[in-house]
Amino acid sequence: MEIILGIVQGLTEFLPISSSGHLSVFSKLFNLKPDLSVFALLHLATLAAIVIFVGKELTEIIKGLIKLEKNYINLTLKIIVSTIPAAIFGVLLESKIEASLSNLKIISFFFLVTSAALLISDKIKGNKDLSTLTYKDALVIGIMQALAIFPGISRSGFTLFGSLLIGLEREIALKYSFLVSIPVILGAGLLEIKNISLNSYSISSAIVAFFFGLLSLFILKKATISKNLKIFSAYCIFISIFSFVLGGIK
């Protein structure tokens, strides 16, 4: 079962279909108790995949900070601004998040919200690069990321949606959406890491999540550039209906 959760986490963490929503659905389907510490371990595994995916950008930022280059200092500050709302929401709404993990009817609604955001994202045109990003833009993206703390709302989908809304070019929007997710995923994982029980099963699950995470990143990149997010939008409608029905049965 841990391997299955690893596959689900790896594929759904970056594909814009909500990993937390899917993990909740699978937990309910197989009568597993939602465990935020397990989710945190899987998040840390997929975090490693993000670091590889945006490795070039991260290296440039680190080098720029070491050299005290103004544009990289400003970019780092904007990434921090995009992170703050999620941190605040996470602290204030922790109990509600845990409750929503077991309520499939609420998750079903949030899947529909994600579907709508993806459908709109396919129609947005942008040509801005990161040099034009303002602190207000960064805050908008941060609010989108904050909303994604609820299962069913995709973090990658909503941060990408926010990045496109403020006019970023599609591939740049995708890369920025993952740059701003790094502190949030890392923070969530570190907060729960003290409760994680490492064993052969959990480690295997994390390794599987890492490799499937890499696969899903490249799938999302292709879908974003070719404006095929509608495929994931349609899937979110399907999983919304499925989770709603499952919530009524279980």
Curated annotation (Swiss-Prot):
GO terms for cellular component: plasma membrane. InterPro entries: UppP (IPR003824). It holds the Pfam family BacA. GO terms for biological process: cell wall organization; peptidoglycan biosynthetic process; regulation of cell shape; response to antibiotic. It is a multi-pass membrane protein. Catalyzes the dephosphorylation of undecaprenyl diphosphate (UPP). Confers resistance to bacitracin. It comes from the Bacteria. It is found in: Cell inner membrane. It catalyses: di-trans,octa-cis-undecaprenyl diphosphate + H2O = di-trans,octa-cis-undecaprenyl phosphate + phosphate + H(+). The chain crosses the membrane at residues 35-55, 73-93, 100-120, 146-166, 171-191, 200-220, 229-249. Bacitracin is thought to be involved in the inhibition of peptidoglycan synthesis by sequestering undecaprenyl diphosphate, thereby reducing the pool of lipid carrier available. This is Undecaprenyl-diphosphatase. Coiled coil: none annotated. Its main location: membrane. Its EC number is 3.6.1.27. Belongs to the UppP family. Keywords: Antibiotic resistance, Cell inner membrane, Cell membrane, Cell shape, Cell wall biogenesis/degradation, Hydrolase, Membrane, Peptidoglycan synthesis, Transmembrane, Transmembrane helix. GO terms for molecular function: undecaprenyl-diphosphatase activity.
